[in-house]
């Protein structure tokens, strides 16, 4: 192990999302989001479940805060349920005081315990009423105004205690999984809608950031940014075709959001392939969008090998996987087909982002679902050897990126604090460092939680 340490200011903790943990879908005035609706559609969720109960964190949040405290974290990243705060979502719709009070109390408790809140405004749960009213993210003018209004209410209600804001979590997933292949809510299948939705989300993000900077930043002193998801990508072999495919895949996954937000324009390969199906920014919009994130929020889990080909335009006509040309695997297989352990890729990705986009990086999600863990009794599930090995590799890569390569990485959040509702997989896949018995809601720390607590204690300057 390296003797080098992360700076004293480095923050670490765990991340969650409202729909994955809260439950209580209609308690205290909350109304449905598109995920409540989507879960009711037959065949959409692998085990036929929903987030109706999840980890019951709307009621058990104090227990969650105490768990965070016991793990010694410095920060906690969580998301707000828009339809808990403005049940019907719109700028003319009534505000739900009970929803604001709930989050205010949670934030106050975190601050009291010395845990810094990192608050995500949108983690995929659009109020259903807005989807019904005007098609949600497909409607540029309406969606931007309603999101900005919601953001403003959150800045007003919580901004005196919250210094770290994230507008959107993983717009790639929202647009591609929600509007491209239909695997996630609202379940649309289209080859044009994802580009429209992406475009509108980038603009909604930029409008919310401008509002924060104009009206709140000076008195509240916080920072605001966005979280993008990306794997590290490596050419499958040494051919020019694989190298070009890798660059193209990176633009289609990451560049489609990062380039406009940090550089002010869409990447060249996307423009070339999509032509006039790619919406254009006006000069005024470019000015608004460019530089609209104070940091780079990164969700990353794995590395993929890339080769040219395939019919998937949303991915950039590439094929990806974990099997090398010689038949060996990149790393340990997880419970999700797309995820294997590969620590070196994490180090390379951190270096790439820091250099390419010139902003401090916060790793806002990183984690591993152990293969078959859901089938194990709790006594075995907590002895999560593969997850511990994953975190050992990834924390070491983080340390090397910061202390050896000089990458400006300022925070790290493990996914997730708890086993929870894993979207289309339902409750079959477990990402938590804390085991949850869904029958009783009993929380039991896994060995990986112990490992991370110890590692960060040893590797952050006193």
UniProtKB/Swiss-Prot annotation:
Effect of residue 173 to C: 2-fold decrease in affinity for cellobiose
A single GO molecular function term of this UniProt record: beta-glucosidase activity
Residues the entry annotates as binding substrate: 20, 123, 169, 301, 415, 422-423
Active-site positions on this chain: 170 (proton donor), 365 (nucleophile)
Highest taxon of the lineage: Eukaryota
The protein's enzyme class: hydrolase
EC number: 3.2.1.21
pH-dependent activity: Optimum pH is 6.0-6.5.
InterPro entries per record: Glyco_hydro_1, Glyco_hydro_1_beta-glucosidase, Glyco_hydro_1_N_CS, Glycoside_hydrolase_SF
Keywords: Carbohydrate metabolism, Cellulose degradation, Glycosidase, Hydrolase, Polysaccharide degradation
Catalytic activity annotation: Hydrolysis of terminal, non-reducing beta-D-glucosyl residues with release of beta-D-glucose
Inducing stimuli: Expressed constitutively in cellobiose and glucose cultures.
UniProt key word Aminoacyl-tRNA synthetase: no
One annotated GO biological process: cellulose catabolic process
Family: Belongs to the glycosyl hydrolase 1 family.
Function statement: Plays an important role in cellulose degradation. Shows hydrolytic activity against several glycosidic compounds.
Protein name stated in the entry: Beta-glucosidase 1A
Native species: Phanerodontia chrysosporium
């Amino acid at each position: 192990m390296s003797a080098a340490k992360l700076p004293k200011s480095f923050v670490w903790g765990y991340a969650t999302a409202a729909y994955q943990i809260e439950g209580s879908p209609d308690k205290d005035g909350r109304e449905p989001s598109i995920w409540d609706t989507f879960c009711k559609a037959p065949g959409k969720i692998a085990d036929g479940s929903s987030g109706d109960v999840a980890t019951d964190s709307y009621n058990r949040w104090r227990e969650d805060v105490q768990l965070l405290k016991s793990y010694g974290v410095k920060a906690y990243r969580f998301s707000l349920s828009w339809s808990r705060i403005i049940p019907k979502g719109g700028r003319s719709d009534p505000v739900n005081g009970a929803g604001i009070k709930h989050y205010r109390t949670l934030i106050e408790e975190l601050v009291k315990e010395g845990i810094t809140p990192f608050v995500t405004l949108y983690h995929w749960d659009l109020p259903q009423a807005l989807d019904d009213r005007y098609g949600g993210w497909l409607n540029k003018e309406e969606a931007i105004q309603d999101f900005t209004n919601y953001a403003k209410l959150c800045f007003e209600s919580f901004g005196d205690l919250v210094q770290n804001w994230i507008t959107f979590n993983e717009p790639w997933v929202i647009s591609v999984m929600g509007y491209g292949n239909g695997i996630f809510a609202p379940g649309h299948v289209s080859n044009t809608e994802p580009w429209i939705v992406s475009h509108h989300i980038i603009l909604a993000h930029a409008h919310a950031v401008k509002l924060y900077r104009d009206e709140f930043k000076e008195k509240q002193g916080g920072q605001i940014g966005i979280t993008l998801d990306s794997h590290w990508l490596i050419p499958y072999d040494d051919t020019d075709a694989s190298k070009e495919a890798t660059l193209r895949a990176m633009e289609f996954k990451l560049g489609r959001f990062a380039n406009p937000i940090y550089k002010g324009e869409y990447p060249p390969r996307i423009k070339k392939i999509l032509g006039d199906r790619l919406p254009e920014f006006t000069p005024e919009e470019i000015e608004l969008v460019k530089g609209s994130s104070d940091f780079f929020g990164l969700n990353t889990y794995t590395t993929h090998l890339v080769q040219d080909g395939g019919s998937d335009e949303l991915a950039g006509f590439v094929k990806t996987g974990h099997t090398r040309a010689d038949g060996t695997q990149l790393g340990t297989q997880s419970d999700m087909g797309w995820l294997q352990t590969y620590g070196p890729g994490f180090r390379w990705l951190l270096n790439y982002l820091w250099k390419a986009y010139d902003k401090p990086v916060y790793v806002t999600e990183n984690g591993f679902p152990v293969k078959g863990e859901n089938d194990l009794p709790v006594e075995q599930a907590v002895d999560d050897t593969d997850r511990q090995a994953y975190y050992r590799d990834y924390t070491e890569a983080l340390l090397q990126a910061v202390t050896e390569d000089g990458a400006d990485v300022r925070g790290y959040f493990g996914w997730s604090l708890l086993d929870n509702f894993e979207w289309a997989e339902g409750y079959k896949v477990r990402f938590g460092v804390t085991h949850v018995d869904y029958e009783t809601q009993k929380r039991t720390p896994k060995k990986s939680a112990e490992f991370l607590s110890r590692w960060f204690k040893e590797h952050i300057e006193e």
